[in-house]
């Protein structure tokens, strides 16, 4: 493809390489390092004048360092006269801080949106935003892609009893997501109402729906410490589910997450590779990964060529 340059930040170079290969491109030359005082240094190693630039950087790992690196890369390309800069952010950072849910709480997702715009981003490509209204925090175009088509494909190919399954949301906020998947699989859905006393701790769970003698498939956009999904798995098994799977777009897996998954009764915990999972998979044999590089690559190709990306909302590109 002419007049396109693809750069990778430090957060997930394996995913960036897969996207580049699917597009038939080589990653652009960029050197990122830290000065002795820990300031981030970025050197763009090739001309981007008049080019359509895409920078892949996921909001994971050292999140603050990686976010700062992305902002500097965007700005470096912008002031080097690129025609357009698109930030490809598979897992959007600070997405859970999307509203003022208590006194004096910051809306940090809005701040991140402002920072990306001020740095010079012309367009954002992301996946399964924690709250879709985050798109409204931007005054530039945002394409929020969905892992759902890839999830549906994985379910059909890897769960033999999927026709006798029930799709379960671990909280009321995910009801729209699970009803969409359940409708497309032509199966029932259920949800779990949870009461939180403080962040990352669930006090009580109430199951709404009948899971008896069915394969329960928990679906959520992300899992962090995994307290919610592990409690949910116990709840589903005690309610008569024959097996429990968890399918998540963003597997953050911080703190006690891995030990909790190892001790929980999951058949598998399936995540996409918006976040690197190689180290976690070595620690937990239950973790499986869905590759979404083809979705990002096709979104980049369609954006570069001025085509619609809505096809990707319901199809997995080859």
From Swiss-Prot:
Keyword entries, A-Z: ATP-binding, Kinase, Magnesium, Metal-binding, Nucleotide biosynthesis, Nucleotide-binding, Transferase
TM segment ranges: none
Location of region: Binding of phosphoribosylpyrophosphate: 212-227
First-tier enzyme category under EC: transferase
Enzyme Commission number(s) of this protein: 2.7.6.1
Regulation (activators, inhibitors): Activated by magnesium and inorganic phosphate. Competitively or non-competitively inhibited by ADP, 2,3-bisphosphoglyceride or GDP.
Pathway the protein contributes to: Metabolic intermediate biosynthesis; 5-phospho-alpha-D-ribose 1-diphosphate biosynthesis; 5-phospho-alpha-D-ribose 1-diphosphate from D-ribose 5-phosphate (route I): step 1/1
Catalysed reactions, semicolon-separated: D-ribose 5-phosphate + ATP = 5-phospho-alpha-D-ribose 1-diphosphate + AMP + H(+)
SMART domains per the UniProt record, alphabetical: Pribosyltran_N (SM01400)
Segments forming a coiled coil: none
UniProt cofactor(s): Mg(2+)
Domain of life, per lineage: Eukaryota
Binding-site positions, Mg(2+): 128, 130, 139, 143
Subunit description: Homodimer. The active form is probably a hexamer composed of 3 homodimers.
Identification of the protein by name: Ribose-phosphate pyrophosphokinase 2
Species assigned in the record: Xenopus tropicalis (Western clawed frog)
Upper lineage: Eukaryota, Metazoa, Chordata, Craniata, Vertebrata
Gene: prps2
